[in-house]
Amino acid sequence: MRAGEKTGVIVVDMQGDFTTWKKGTLAVNGADEGFVKKVADATAIFKEKGFVLYATQDWHPKSHISFASNHPGSKPFEAVKIDGRTQVLWPDHCVQGTDGAKILLDAGIFQAIVKKGQDPKFDSYSGFQDDGGAKTEMDTLLKTAGIKKLVVYGLATDYCVMATAIDAAANGYKVIVIEGLSKGVAPDTTAKALETMKAKGIQVLKEVDMKRIGDL
């Protein structure tokens, strides 16, 4: 059995609006053209080695609750209370059908692309479920494929990568996060995210190490 047969890869939100390369509306520092190429090259190698590839895609309606533009008097990056929940407000990003929402890797290499954040009432950092608890098809897809272990990376370390990795672990998968194939919004929250993931039993590797991934 090849090492990758029961191992899946989730590439998180590698979309134009999250990159400095595409001058995205919610660009993550360091997510430049070189970083995107590094992620694309690593993802191609995982494919060659028999890993099953999945992607998440932020896919918001214009009326999405997380957009500061939908909250008169509020500004991006403010936190507000909505129905008892704390909601961080963001610039409009990854609006359905826009260039900024497009995945920057070849879509053809993925077994499936799981869209998230389509419900205007709830944010969705995780590829498994939104903040309201509504599940995506991710867990069903992975279990149908017999995936037991997941390699997770992308944008951003301290938000959607962390949320996806934590939910993957909660759903019973062995999870490995590749720090060098991810970028975070801020250094302090990124460091905290890495520690939080480790505390939940998630393995964090600095870079791709096929032997360690196979052994974990």
Q: Language-model features: where?
A:
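Active-site acidic carboxylates
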Residues: M1-G117, T144, K148, A169-V177, ...
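Short, well-ordered secondary-structure micro-motifs
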Residues: S66-F67, S124-G127, A163, D188
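Short, surface-exposed loop/turn motifs that are enriched in glycine and acidic residues
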Residues: D92-G97, S124-D131, G154
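Glycine-rich anion-binding loop/nest that anchors nucleotide
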Residues: I147-A163, V177-S182
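Buried hydrophobic packing segments
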Residues: T164-A168
